[in-house]
Structures are given as structure tokens and as C-alpha cells.
Amino acid sequence: MNVQSLIKEGLALFKNKKFDEAIAKLKQALGQIEDKNSQIEEQNEIQAGLGRCYLEQAMKAEGKESEQLFGNAVEHYQQQLGLAEQLEDKQNSLQQQIYAQFGLGNCYFEQAMKAQGKESKQLFEHAVEYFQRQLSLAAQLADKQNSLQQQIYAQSWLGNCYFEQAKKAKGKESKQLFGHAVEHLQRQLRLAEQLADKQNSLQEQNNAQFGLGKCYLEQAKKAKGKGSEQLFGQAVEHHQQQLRLAEQLEDKQNSLQEQIYAQSWLGSCYFEQAIIQQKWERYF
């Protein structure tokens, strides 16, 4: 069986969540490439596939096993990055580097979500670093629409990193991190508005408004008094925008699903606000 056939089989196994078998098949494909200075595209694809397999396994594992699997994933994504940089077609090279940087960012993000305290903070910082590199590479893509789309993905992940950090932090640090999250999500929204495909633009704007609403809701739950009230108002405003965008989606089933999400989050806003108000009434 040739290298391409083995890669194809390996990726099919990955899609079926047979990760151990996929890893074995992809390593078999890599072993068939005797001259590692040749077949760079194939090697790039193999390393990306191995990174994805180990990442999926790491997310499900616990303790030292999870840590080791994350290490394996990072190693393969680093290998992919080195190969992507060697690709002769500059635009393809940039695109593959973007995928590798995203993979690395995702590895550290998922580790950070499992960790606590200083370790979690450090891992989030690594994730941000890789997502920033992803963003920088995305801005260099010649195809404007693809460049916008890839920048949207990077801004979304940066926003998510800061949002999850902010939830774990307290006081001024939490407030500052929420501010960073909002900043990236606002940039995501502005980029989404520039997409030429109207339906894709609406979907991406919807996603950004959801992220913004979620940020303000979490801040509101941590805040007190008038500050909390104002933040709840901002959360409601963004989820209302999310709802309006969802109503404009042409795919009826997707539109209904997105409207359900928006209505659910609006309900959460009012519910959380009522709970806090009730607590303050009891206090006084």
C-alpha cells in the first residue's frame, strides 16, 4: 500500500474515532518515506493527523497519561510546522502553518482548561502566543476572503482564551482579562461584517455576538450593584443582536437552532439577574 493510501486510511480511522489504529496507520505511512527531504506535503499531512489523534486522546485522558498525550500532540504539531515552512507554494505554506499554529494553540488551551492556578495561567499564555501567530499568518494570505475567515477563527480563539482565564481569575485581574476577551470578540465581529458571502457573514456575526453576550453575562455574575445591572444590560443587548442575526439565516433548521441558542442565553441573563437581585433584597 502506498503512502497516500495509508494516509487516507489513517484519516478515515480518525474520523471514526479509532485513534490508536489511526496513529498506527499514519506512522506506517511515515515509515514508508525513506528520504525525509522528499514528499514534504505528505509528511505535513501525516504529522497534522498524528497531532489531532494525540490531542483527542489527551482531552479524554486524566493525570500523567493526559499530560504525556498532550506532549505527543505538541511534538507532532511542531513537526508539522517545520514541514509547512518548507512548502514551496508560499500561500499553501502559510495556510499549513496556520493549521499547525492553531493545533499548538488548541493543545495548550485544552491543557489550561484541565489545569489549575499558576499552571493553568501559564498554559493559557502559551495558547494565546500560538493563536497570535495564527492571526499574524492569516493576515498574510493573498485571498482576502480566506484571510478574513482565518483571522475570524484566530480572534475567536483569542477571545475564548481570555474569557476562560477571566472566569478562573478574581478581582482586577478578572476584569482586565474580560476586557481582552471583549476586544478580540469585537475584532471578530468587525471582520465578520466584511465577509462577501452574506450567509457566512451573518453566521460569523451571530457567533461573535454570542461570545460578547457570554462575556458580559459572566462579568455581570461576578459584579455587584449598578455595575452588575449595567453588564447584564450589555449581555442582553448582544444576545438580542444574536437573535436578530439568527432570524436572517436562510437555512431554516440552522436559523431555528441559532434562535433557540439566543433565546436560551437571553433567558439565562434574566434568570441570573433575578437571582442576584433577590440576594440583594434579602441582604437589605
Predicted regions, residues:
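Short helix-adjacent coil turns
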Residues: 17-18, 65-68, 88, 122, ...
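Alpha-helical segment of the N-proximal tetratricopeptide repeat
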Residues: 4-28, 59-60, 68, 114, ...
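TPR-repeat structural position
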Residues: 19, 60-63, 70, 114, ...
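Flexible helix-coil transition and linker loops at the boundaries of alpha-helical arrays
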Residues: 30-44, 64, 80-97, 134-151, ...
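Conserved alpha-helical positions within TPR/SEL1-like repeat arrays
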Residues: 7-15, 42-59, 95-110, 149-164, ...
